[in-house]
Amino acid sequence: MILGVGTDIVYIPRISNLWKKFGIKFLTRVFNQKEIEDSYKYTNFDAQVRHFAKRFAAKEAYVKALGTGFGQSIKMSDIVILNNPYGKPQITVSNSNPIHKIELSISDEKDYAIAFIVIYNANIKL
């Protein structure tokens, strides 16, 4: 059973501007250390910005799917987006309900990054 669907689109230059303005403070407030380390595989700044923009969109899409938004119960850094060995993005959330399964798709084109999330009950076959 589908419990929630969320989508978000991010203007990539916005993420670039935030990073340039606030530096590491921006990154550590929004991203988990593993996500930051994962960006090191990209040697140029633009590729790193795209990496972070897609993950930013995924985090926003996740809380939209939950219907809660960000607040005291969940922070952006509680949501971790990493790729599996095959390149598929996967989401891990601190203190999430273990019976929830989360499917994530992220993409970028020109100045925009987009994410789409479906949360469903893992005990019920789709």
Swiss-Prot record:
Keyword entries, A-Z: Cytoplasm, Fatty acid biosynthesis, Fatty acid metabolism, Lipid biosynthesis, Lipid metabolism, Magnesium, Metal-binding, Transferase
Cofactor(s) the record lists: Mg(2+)
Subcellular location, in the record's words?
Answer: Cytoplasm
| Catalytic function, reaction form | apo-[ACP] + CoA = holo-[ACP] + adenosine 3',5'-bisphosphate + H(+)
Q: Where does Mg(2+) bind?
A: 8, 60
**Pfam family, any one:** ACPS
GO CC entries: cytosol
Q: Does the keyword Ribosomal protein apply?
A: no
**What is this enzyme's EC?**
2.7.8.7
Could you provide one GO biological process annotation from this protein's UniProt record?
fatty acid biosynthetic process
Question: InterPro entries, from UniProt?
Answer: 4-PPantetheinyl_Trfase_dom, 4-PPantetheinyl_Trfase_dom_sf, ACPS, P-Pant_transferase_sf, Ppantetheine-prot_Trfase_dom
Q: What Gene Ontology molecular-function terms does this entry list?
A: holo-[acyl-carrier-protein] synthase activity; magnesium ion binding
Q: Which family does it belong to?
A: Belongs to the P-Pant transferase superfamily. AcpS family.
Function, please?
A: Transfers the 4'-phosphopantetheine moiety from coenzyme A to a Ser of acyl-carrier-protein.
What is the protein's given name? Holo-[acyl-carrier-protein] synthase
Natural source organism: Ehrlichia canis (strain Jake)
Q: Which gene encodes it?
A: acpS
